[in-house]
Amino acid sequence: MIIPSIDLSDGQAVQWRQGKDPVLARGDVFELLERFRLYGEVAVIDLDAATGTGSNADLIRELLATGAPIRVGGGIRDLDTARTWLKAGAARVILGTAAREDWVTQLPRDRVVVALDARGDEWTTHGWQEGSGQQVADLIGPLAARCGAFLYTQVEKEGMMQGVDWPRVEAVVKASPVPVTVAGGITTPEDVARLHRLGADAQIGMAVYTGALDLDDAFVAQIDFAKGDGLVPTVTQDAASGE
């Protein structure tokens, strides 16, 4: 599965390199959502809430009101906030360091995604700004019991469009008893296809926003034509009527 990402800061969709260097900002957030939702779930991340510099909560509520399947992340640090987003229509909530808190067990496990944000092998916190001193590998087992999936982000690769650190990705996917979504450095359809073969999903941002990766190509890359005995799933549409 591909999961396009809308990272929000000051009411705009933004992309940062390595979580700190702004690259672009766009105001057409709702148009992006309408496009991205065609491929399945969309990740909407409140960067301001994650870094403690503000909030895009009102905008996220409006996005959820469209009925699009959205996983919400950024700044969710207590049970009330997590429940509020789920009640507002979020398909899932993405939790960072808060995933270690006891209240997390009161949430529906299948609607919780735990963010494993890593610089190298170290888990980072506070919107990727600080190191925790903990190794990602040591967290997978204990945190897997609290969630339905992990979001593994390679912070050093985020926004760089220089490829994925495959040995680390493969190690995390292999060690995890729950599904893993990978983010950071995913640039080509081949990257998406390789993740699919590993059994992982691809959360994509910078490559899509800059036009380096076409979402249709990324979607098709997940299809294993060999398994279908030459059959290809299709959706047909009348060019004249649009039906």
Regions found by a protein language model. Name each.
Residues 41-55, 59, 152-161:
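Glycine-rich, proline-tolerant flexible connector loops at the mouths of alpha/beta enzymes
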Residues 6-22, 83, 90-158:
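Conserved anion-binding
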Residues 2-8, 42-44, 70-74, 93-95, ...:
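Hydrophobic faces of well-ordered beta-strands that scaffold small-molecule active sites
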Residues 102-114, 192-221:
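C-terminal helical cap(s) of enzyme catalytic domains, especially alpha/beta-barrels
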Residues 129, 136-137, 207, 212-243:
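Flexible "arm" and connector segments at domain edges
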Residues 58-60, 65-95, 102-104, 167-202:
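Catalytic cores of alpha/beta
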Residues 25, 54-61, 129-138, 162-171:
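Charged helix-capping and loop-helix junction motifs
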Residues 18-36:
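Short catalytic helix/loop segments, enriched in acidic residues and glycine
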